[in-house]
C-alpha cells in the first residue's frame, strides 16, 4: 500500500510584528481583553514590506524542499490553499512554479477553502499519491488576511496575521496520512465574507464576520469531525500524540482538546505569536513544532480546521 508521507516542512512569516499594545493605539481594545477572548498577543504582518502571498509561499516551499532533501525537479504537483491570491489569475501555484523553476509537465493549482484550505489541499494531495501515482507533491497554505481586514473593526482586526507554511508529501510504504475528512455547508456562507469579486465589489474589500455564531459552529463541527476521523481510522483518542489545530481562537482550541481528552501540553499552539494566519496556520504550527524537536517521526498527529464557506476538515497522520 502506498501512503502520502510528510518528508519536509517549511514556513515563512513577515518580519514586522503588530502587538496588542500597537492595536490599543488603533482601536478601542486592550491586551488583556484580546488575550482573554482570543489568545493572541502579537501577529506578523506584511504592512509595507515587499512580501506578498506568492513570495511567502515560495519562501516556505524552499524551506520544506530543503528539509525534505529532494531535488525540486522531482516535484510532480503543486497545490496551494489560499483565499488571498495576488490575482484572480494566474494562480498562486503557477507563480510558485515559476519562481522555483519547476518543470512544466506537472499540474499546479489553487484551492480556496479559506482557513480550512491547507487541510483541503492535503486531502487532495493524499488522493493523488494513493491513487494517481504522484511521488512528490508540494502543498502550501498561505494567506495575507491583514490586507482585507477592516482596521477600524476591533472585533476582527485583532485576530489575523500573515504567513505561509508548506510540506513536501512523498509516496512511501510506511504509514503517513491515514485519513482525511472534508465537510462544508453553504447555508452558513454569510457568516464570514470578503465580498470583492467579479460580480460584487466593495471599494475596499473587507473581511466581515459574525463572531459569536462562528464560534458556536466551530466548537460543534470541529468536535464532531475529530470524533468522526478517529472512528473512521479505527483508533482511540489515547492514540493521538499531538493535536495541531487551526489557530483561530484559543477557546475553540481548548474545547476541541477537552473533547479529545488531550492535556494542553499535547496541543501545538502558536496563536499567541502568530494570530490567525488562515490556511497557513496549521503548517506554520507544524513547522515550528518539528524544528523545536517537539514532534518526532512516528508521532500520530490530528489536524483540524474551520473557515469561511463554511468549510471544515480534519486529517489524521503519522509523521
Curated annotation (Swiss-Prot):
Its main location: cytoplasm. GO terms for cellular component: cytoplasm. It is an enzyme of class 2 (transferase). It catalyses: malonyl-[ACP] + acetyl-CoA + H(+) = 3-oxobutanoyl-[ACP] + CO2 + CoA. Keywords: Acyltransferase, Cytoplasm, Fatty acid biosynthesis, Fatty acid metabolism, Lipid biosynthesis, Lipid metabolism, Multifunctional enzyme, Transferase. CDD domains: KAS_III. Signal peptide: none annotated. This is Beta-ketoacyl-[acyl-carrier-protein] synthase III.
Amino acid at each position: 500500500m502506498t501512503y502520502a508521507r510528510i518528508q519536509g516542512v517549511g514556513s515563512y512569516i513577515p518580519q514586522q510584528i503588530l502587538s496588542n499594545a500597537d492595536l490599543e493605539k488603533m482601536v478601542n481594545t486592550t491586551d488583556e481583553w484580546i488575550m482573554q477572548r482570543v489568545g493572541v498577543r502579537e501577529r506578523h504582518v506584511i504592512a509595507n514590506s515587499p512580501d506578498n502571498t506568492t513570495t511567502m509561499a515560495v519562501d516556505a516551499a524552499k524551506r520544506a524542499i530543503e528539509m525534505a532533501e529532494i531535488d525540486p525537479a522531482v516535484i510532480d504537483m503543486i497545490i496551494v490553499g489560499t483565499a488571498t491570491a495576488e490575482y484572480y489569475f494566474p494562480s498562486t501555484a503557477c507563480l510558485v512554479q515559476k519562481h522555483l523553476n519547476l518543470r512544466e509537465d506537472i499540474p499546479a493549482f489553487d484551492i480556496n477553502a479559506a482557513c480550512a484550505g491547507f487541510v483541503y489541499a492535503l486531502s487532495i494531495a493524499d488522493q493523488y499519491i494513493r491513487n494517481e501515482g504522484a511521488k512528490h507533491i508540494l502543498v502550501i497554505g498561505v494567506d495575507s488576511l491583514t490586507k482585507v481586514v477592516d482596521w477600524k473593526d476591533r472585533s476582527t482586526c485583532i485576530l489575523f496575521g500573515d504567513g505561509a507554511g508548506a510540506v513536501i508529501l512523498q509516496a512511501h510504504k510506511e504509514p503517513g496520512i491515514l485519513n482525511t475528512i472534508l465537510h462544508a455547508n453553504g447555508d452558513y456562507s454569510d457568516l464570514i465574507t470578503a465580498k470583492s469579486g467579479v460580480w460584487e465589489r466593495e471599494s475596499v474589500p473587507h473581511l466581515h464576520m459574525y463572531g459569536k455564531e462562528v464560534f458556536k459552529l466551530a466548537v460543534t463541527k470541529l468536535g464532531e469531525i475529530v470524533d468522526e476521523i478517529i472512528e473512521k481510522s479505527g483508533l482511540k483518542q489515547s492514540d493521538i500524540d499531538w493535536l495541531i489545530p487551526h489557530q483561530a481562537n484559543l477557546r475553540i482550541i481548548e474545547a476541541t482538546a477537552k473533547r479529545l481528552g488531550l492535556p494542553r501540553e499535547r496541543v501545538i499552539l502558536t496563536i499567541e505569536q502568530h494570530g490567525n494566519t488562515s490556511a497557513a496556520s496549521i503548517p506554520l504550527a507544524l513547522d515550528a513544532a518539528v524544528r523545536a524537536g517537539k514532534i518526532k517521526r512516528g508521532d500520530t498527529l490530528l489536524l483540524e480546521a474551520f473557515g469561511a464557506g463554511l468549510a471544515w476538515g480534519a486529517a489524521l497522520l503519522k509523521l
